[in-house]
């Protein structure tokens, strides 16, 4: 399966039990900031934004004072899982980022998708990739 198929079929799919509810944007990005696959709506990010995200995985709490920035959008960092998941909130939407051995799985959502639904979709794919040694 191509990386794009993972984004299209596992991240941008309908949320279980909620036909038509999908993540706004999604991507799989390598630890080196190379984009493996992304939805057409995924924001163009700056290298320093990705560096900040990687630093927060290695030093949990790094982004809390400044917020998480992606594509120029600022998210307030909310409770995640140290070294494994970063979650952010902005208005009625937000972001979930799951770290795997080689990549970061991104999901961005807006209402009616809930934070929990975004977490489920992103973390399920991230956990699968971890199980595959990726």
Curated annotation (Swiss-Prot):
Keyword line: Actin-binding, Allergen, Cytoplasm, Cytoskeleton, Disulfide bond, Phosphoprotein
Modified sites of kind Phosphothreonine: 114
Keyword match Phosphoprotein: yes
GO cellular component: a single term: cytoskeleton
Motif (Involved in PIP2 interaction): 84-100
CDD domains in UniProt: PROF
Annotated signal peptide: none
Post-translational modification: Phosphorylated by MAP kinases.
Disulfide bond residue pairs: 13-118
Gene Ontology molecular function: any one: actin monomer binding
Complexes and interactors: Occurs in many kinds of cells as a complex with monomeric actin in a 1:1 ratio.
This protein's name: Profilin-2
Source organism of the structure: Olea europaea
């Amino acid at each position: 399966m191509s990386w794009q198929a993972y984004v299209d079929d596992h991240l941008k799919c309908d949320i279980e039990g909620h036909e038509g509810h999908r993540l706004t944007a999604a991507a799989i990005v390598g630890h080196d900031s190379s984009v493996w696959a992304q939805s057409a709506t995924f924001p163009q990010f700056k290298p320093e934004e990705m560096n900040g995200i990687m630093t927060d995985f290695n030093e949990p709490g790094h982004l809390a004072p400044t917020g998480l920035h992606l594509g120029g959008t600022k998210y307030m960092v909310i409770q995640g899982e140290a070294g494994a998941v970063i979650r952010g909130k902005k208005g009625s939407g937000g972001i979930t980022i799951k770290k795997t051995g080689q990549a970061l799985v991104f999901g961005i959502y807006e209402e009616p998708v809930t934070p929990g639904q975004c977490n489920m979709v992103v973390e399920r794919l991230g956990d699968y990739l971890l199980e595959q040694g990726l």
